[in-house]
A protein has these predicted regions:
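Signature of N6-adenine DNA methyltransferases within the class I
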Residues: 1-192, 217, 227, 233-234, ...
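Structural motif
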Residues: 11, 197, 284, 422-427
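Generic recognition of flexible, low-complexity loop/linker segments
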Residues: 22-23, 66-70, 189-194, 210, ...
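Active-site proximal loops enriched in glycine and acidic residues that flank catalytic Cys/His/Asp
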Residues: 37-39, 65-67, 207, 255-257, ...
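Non-catalytic DNA-recognition/assembly elements of restriction-modification systems
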Residues: 138-143, 154, 169, 320-488
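Contiguous C-terminal substrate-recognition/catalytic subdomains in enzyme active sites
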Residues: 180-181, 192-244, 252
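Short Ser/Thr-interspersed hydrophobic loop/turn segments at strand-loop and sheet-helix junctions
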Residues: 244-262, 289-303
């Protein structure tokens, strides 16, 4: 390590990167070097100086990027490449085999196919001088001329992108919102000053979460009582900064995700956490940026900027923005947020949950489910149509008609369809909540979650008097869970 740091300080990210440079220095000018290495050097910031060395001091002649797990003997994704040890103006040949699963035999077959047929769809020719057009200079050999133009002429990303509250001890200071006394949660607070004045203990915070577009994944709270006094007194590696941004409107996403990149709208009143970075716009084109980030165009761009599973502020800030059709884009974005929020709030895990969607004025649960299913299908289909229209708009704006298609697969639409098993189980859960008084048929949202009991809220269905509900394998009690559910 000491030798590497002393002699190859700019290439110390890994032994292999220092060795590549060392091999180049040992090779005569115009000679050739070939390597089989992890492919992280092609994209990650810590290898940028290695990339620039190869661009300026050498010429990449060939490179094959293998499928993520193709080479079983390696524990990391790999590539193989060869370069001439001097810089000349010429295009290199690149094979992109990342989509072909099945091990090295499949990779071998695809390599031979590309050699015979350059129109196969995964063979590319690119001049390394073009790589510097993209911020960070990644080896984005498959970037088209139109895409490179967007980096040259596009506008700077308008948001201020940040990572937020880092407690240093999530097990102690983070909770799901329904795990604590709701009277101690600071909802509807819109600034750092209001947080302090509220005397509340818990506050909503972004936390990343599963693949979801437009709205949702809001279920986490953080203990910042007395401006985080407990964290400051007991934790060393915490980060509580940028308090001027607390509780502001923003866009958030999950920083580390093996799935597709998805963004969500954050309304005022929610803190920004470390696992859910945010971008603040201060009313400057937030809706437009949200639409772009959730489009296929952004996914294509992030393929160059963040081809690993990490979507940090640095990668997002490098996305080039081209403005057009703003009114139409903004209207579709607001519609999508509403559709996604309606879906999110239909389940108990949302703190804005009002009542169960199967609670309807129809004779049977079967009829209620049929209505709910129709609503879910309509919402799903509308959101899919809206997303495809936004894809069309951005594909046209960026001139990528020959590269991308607007269609969205059903698996990538992130509102939920009706599911009989799941929804009946959640209905039983809601019924149990009514039995214990947490919910009421006469009141939207939470009827009781601590504090003073108000019996007037339970006119239609009374909560269990002793708050004990037997669960038996047969009908032994009139007030067991089966009897109460039938009554419900």
């Amino acid at each position: 390590n000491d030798f590497i740091k002393k002699n190859y300080a700019d290439y110390k990210s890994d032994f292999f990167s220092a060795f590549v440079i060392h091999a180049s220095q040992m090779t005569k000018q115009s000679g050739y070097c070939g390597f089989f290495t992890p492919y992280v050097w092609m994209f990650i910031q810590s290898y940028e100086k290695m990339r620039n060395y190869l661009y300026n001091q050498a010429t990449i002649e060939t490179l094959i990027q293998f499928e993520y797990s193709a080479f079983e003997e390696a524990t990391v994704p790999v590539c193989t490449f060869a370069f001439q040890n001097r810089h000349v103006q010429k295009k290199g040949c690149y094979l992109r085999l990342v989509d072909f699963r099945g091990g090295m035999e499949v990779q071998r077959q695809k390599t031979l196919e590309a050699i015979k047929n350059h129109d196969c769809g995964f063979y590319y020719e690119q001049n390394t001088d073009n790589f510097s057009i993209i911020p960070g200079s990644p080896v984005a050999y498959w970037a088209s001329t139109k895409m490179l133009e967007s980096f040259q002429t596009g506008n700077k990303f308008a948001g201020e992108t940040k990572k937020g509250v880092l407690t240093g001890d999530n097990n102690t200071y983070l909770r799901l919102w329904h795990e604590v006394n709701i009277g101690k949660i600071g909802f509807e607070l819109y600034s750092h000053a209001e947080m302090i004045d509220s005397s509340m203990k818990w506050f909503p915070v972004t936390s990343g979460g599963e693949k979801r577009r437009w709205y949702g994944n809001f279920d986490t709270i953080v203990n910042l009582e007395n401006d985080g006094a407990d964290i400051k007194a007991n934790v060393k590696n915490y980060r509580l900064r940028d308090s001027q941004y607390y509780m502001l409107e923003a866009i958030t996403w999950t920083e580390i995700s093996s799935s597709i990149f998805t963004c969500r709208y954050v309304p005022k009143g929610i803190l920004f956490g470390n696992g859910g970075p945010v971008s603040f716009f201060f009313n400057k084109k937030l809706m437009y940026h949200l639409a772009l980030l959730n489009s296929k165009v952004a996914m294509e761009i992030l393929g160059y900027l963040a081809p690993t599973i990490n979507y940090g502020p640095e990668q997002i800030n490098r996305i080039p923005i081209v403005y057009s059709n703003e009114d139409e884009v903004n209207q579709l974005t607001k519609w999508n947020i509403l559709l996604s929020q309606t879906d999110w709030d239909s389940f108990e895990t949302s703190w804005d949950f009002q009542h169960h969607p199967l609670l309807r004025k129809v004779p049977t649960i079967a009829e209620a489910f049929d209505q709910w299913q129709a609503e879910c299908d309509d919402r799903f289909n509308q959101l899919k149509a809206n997303e495809e229209e936004l894809n069309r708009i951005f594909i046209d704006i960026y001139g990528l008609q020959d590269e991308l298609i607007p269609e969205v697969e059903d698996k990538d639409v992130t509102v939920r369809k009706a599911d009989l098993g799941r929804d009946i189980r959640s209905f039983i859960s809601y019924a149990v909540g009514c039995m214990f008084g947490r919910y009421s048929l006469d009141v939207d949202g939470l009827a009781y979650a601590g504090g003073e009991w108000d019996a007037s809220k339970y006119a239609s269905f009374a909560a269990d008097k002793d708050n004990i509900i037997p669960i038996c394998d047969d009908e032994y009690f009139e007030d067991d869970i089966v009897g109460l559910f039938v009554e419900f």
